[in-house]
Design a protein with these regions (language model features):
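Soluble non-cytosolic domains of exported or imported proteins
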Residues: 56, 86-90, 122-126, 171-175, ...
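Conserved "repeat-terminator" motif of extracellular CCP/Sushi domains
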Residues: 585, 637-649
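Periplasmic/cell-envelope proteins involved in peptidoglycan metabolism and beta-lactam response
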Residues: 1-273, 364-376, 484-487, 504-506, ...
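Short, solvent-exposed beta-strand edge segments and adjacent coil->beta transition regions
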Residues: 75-77, 115-119, 214-218, 285-287, ...
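BRCT (BRCA1 C-terminal) domain core and associated BRCT-interaction motifs
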Residues: 618-638
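Conserved SxxK-family serine transpeptidase/carboxypeptidase catalytic domain
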Residues: 17, 121-127, 131-133, 147-162, ...
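Beta-lactam-recognizing serine transpeptidase/beta-lactamase-like catalytic domain environment
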Residues: 2, 70, 197-208, 249, ...
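Generic structural detector for well-ordered beta-strands
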Residues: 220-222, 317, 459, 595, ...
């Protein structure tokens, strides 16, 4: 076949065009793959990368027996990339609003932002995050996704709420120990730079940078969750019986200063702290200033005895009134008691007798002893908001001021200061520093530091302390504190009823009182000091002897069983500890869970029958009578939970 010159020219032209196109394509491909690759990657990632800062878990707070009081759990948080949302913001808001805390209007506003990352809801409840995840899948919603975050969880609800405090969304402690120990408990920050696909899901292997530090240290408290539960349950009953505005209880070991329980009412659940009020958050056992009233009389009496200004057998002829600086002080019943000694003055809380003792001792000596007891200064406990208290300047005190202070008026103290002072009386005059942190542990669970018991003073000699303790035992067994008496045990204590201070206008609030009782025991070998304060009772009596002393009895009658103390009888012999007639009836909560009682002292059959009735699995260890249990009294357990109880003959 012959090819003409024109045909050759056309073929040559076509080849040249194809070669040019090939060169252009190869050149462009080379530019894209080699020269412009890094620039394109940067542009692409700048559109879809997400810079996330996630908090690693806080350390756990345990009670003295290793029971968790505050812990961190993994939850899911919902975020959005508004640039990837295909549906209208209002449509997306309509879908997810029922399951998130953000309102529809705020969701719409967030989804209209010119950004690649906005939070929609942090630390969601599991059922709600599952519901949203299902909606995302069913409705093919793009641009919504979850990230795991650590959330603070309080497994016992409101137990020790004011002591523990709470943590904000950004893992910052906002109250209580969570705030004070924030640096110790807080973990580090996890930072991730993540590339995502068009649906907002992280692309596998696209984490550009990641730093995952260790979680925070753990803290063990001196608090005993079982004793805390006993105290709070007693307070709940007291609030119901009295209709009081506030109430508080402190339980302390006088030999170590360890706080075993600290409870307040009203209260709140730190899992839902946003539902609480400022009143609910107050740890009034530490922060509240009040006039101690008659509970202060043993402090004055001990100062008079220790200084030698008053003798134990010294007689005062009480005529029912005491005059000072033109004012007349009377007894609570307006009557005189005739010839009385110190034991009678304290036992029957005789105001006139205390005024005589105080003024005989003098302002300087009394003030010195009162300050040696720690009044007027903080205890230094590891809790926020502690008050100093208010005392007279001895140089400015009149005879009336001395008489007034001698009956616990004209000064202001905190409940914790009173517990510290009575701890000294119970502990042979040796005063311990109250503390609530027992130890710190690292992430491996190794104890790194402990809080050792610390003697902070000896305000009175041991002999004086024993004398006052014996007198206070008579106050409970024979005097005004008989409603605090627990049959078979020797407890010492003092009742108090004081008018409330008017902090705005000065003076006192008419008809408003703080009723209190503070005691310790057993007197022979004190294991605990217990203070009960009831603020502004609205129902029934206003007197500490009538409404605070029974709360003390309620608490210590359970404590002697918890400590397995054998009662003492008057002839000095002892009898074996026995439980109540029968275990409390099983009471199920709405979800079928039950609160475990204290099984100690009950027979194998009694414990078995109770657990079977409660729908729980009985795992006995031994036979005879119960001596201990793995799950502590007060633990809330679900149906079918194995309950381990140890028995012995």
């Amino acid at each position: 076949m012959n090819i003409s010159g024109n045909d050759n020219k056309r073929i040559e032209y076509t080849v040249r065009v194809l070669l040019c196109i090939a060169v252009v394509l190869v050149g462009r491909l080379f530019f894209l793959q080699i020269i412009d690759k890094s620039d394109l990657q940067a542009k692409n990632l700048s559109q879809v990368q997400v810079d996330r800062k996630l908090q690693s878990p806080r350390g756990t707070i345990y009670d003295r027996n290793g029971r968790p009081l505050a812990m961190s759990v993994v939850t899911k948080s919902l975020y959005a990339d508004p640039k990837m949302i295909k549906q209208s913001p209002s449509e997306v808001a309509e879908l997810i609003a029922p399951y998130v805390t953000m309102s529809k209007a705020d969701i719409v506003k967030s989804l209209q932002e010119d950004t690649a990352f906005v939070w929609i809801d942090r630390m969601m409840e599991p059922e709600k995050s599952k519901a949203v995840a299902q909606l995302i899948e069913d409705k093919n919603v793009e641009g919504l996704n979850f990230v795991e975050e650590s959330k603070r969880y309080y497994p016992n609800g409101n137990l020790a709420a004011q002591v523990l405090g709470f943590v904000g969304t950004d893992d910052k402690g906002l109250d209580g120990l969570e705030m004070v120990l924030d640096d110790e408990l807080k973990g580090g920050i996890q930072k991730e730079l993540v590339a995502t696909d068009r649906k907002g899901n992280a692309i596998f292997g696209s984490v550009l940078s990641k730093y995952l530090p260790d979680k925070g240290k753990s803290v063990t408290l001196t608090i005993d969750a079982s004793i805390q539960f006993i105290a709070e349950r007693a307070l709940d009953k007291a609030m119901e019986d009295t209709g009081a505005k506030h109430a508080s209880v402190i339980v302390m070991d006088p030999k170590t200063g360890e706080i075993l329980a600290m409870a307040n009412r009203p209260t709140y659940d730190p899992n839902h702290y946003s539902q609480g009020s400022e009143e609910d958050f107050k740890n009034i056992a530490v922060t509240n200033l009040y006039e101690p009233g008659s509970t202060f009389k043993p402090i004055i009496a001990s100062a008079a005895l220790a200084s030698g200004k008053w003798k134990l057998d010294q007689v005062y002829n009480d005529k029912g009134s005491f005059a000072a600086n033109g004012h007349v002080m009377q007894n609570w019943n307006g009557e005189g008691y005739g010839p009385v000694r110190l034991i009678d003055i304290l036992k029957f809380s005789i105001n006139t007798g205390m005024a005589e003792i105080g003024t005989t001792t003098g302002a300087d000596i009394l003030s010195k002893y009162v300050r040696n007891y720690g009044f007027g200064s903080k205890t230094g406990i590891e809790l926020p908001g502690e008050g100093d208290g208010i005392l007279y300047n001895p140089d400015d005190m009149s005879k009336l001021d001395v008489a007034t202070m001698s009956i616990g008026q004209g000064i202001a103290v905190t409940p914790l200061q009173m517990v510290r002072a009575f701890g000294a009386i119970a502990n042979g005059g040796s005063m311990m520093k109250p503390h609530i942190v027992k130890s710190y542990s690292n992430i491996k669970g190794e104890v790194t530091s402990t809080t050792d018991p610390e003697v902070v003073g000896q305000p009175i000699p041991e002999e004086t302390a024993k004398t006052i303790a014996d007198i206070l035992e008579k106050e409970v067994s024979e005097g005004g504190g008989t409603k605090a008496m627990v049959e078979g045990y020797h407890f010492g204590g003092k009742t108090g009823t004081a008018q409330k201070l008017d902090t705005k206008n000065g003076g006192y609030l008419a008809g408003r009182y703080i009723a209190s009782f503070i005691g310790f025991g057993p007197v022979e070998d004190p294991k605990f000091v217990v203070l009960v304060a009831i603020d502004d009772s609205k129902k029934g009596s206003i007197y500490g002897s009538q409404i605070a002393a029974p709360v003390f009895k309620n608490i210590v009658s359970q404590l002697v069983r918890y400590y397995q103390m054998s009662p003492s009888v008057k002839d000095g012999a002892t009898v074996a500890a026995v439980p109540a007639a029968k275990l409390p009836a099983v009471k199920s909560n709405g979800d079928g869970s039950v609160v475990l009682p204290d099984f100690r002292g009950y027979t194998f059959g009694e414990v078995r029958d109770w657990l079977h009735t409660a729908g729980l699995y009985f795992k006995p260890d031994g036979t005879g009578k119960a001596i201990s249990q793995e799950q502590l009294p007060g633990t809330v357990v679900s149906p079918g939970t194995p309950i381990v109880v140890q028995f012995s003959h």
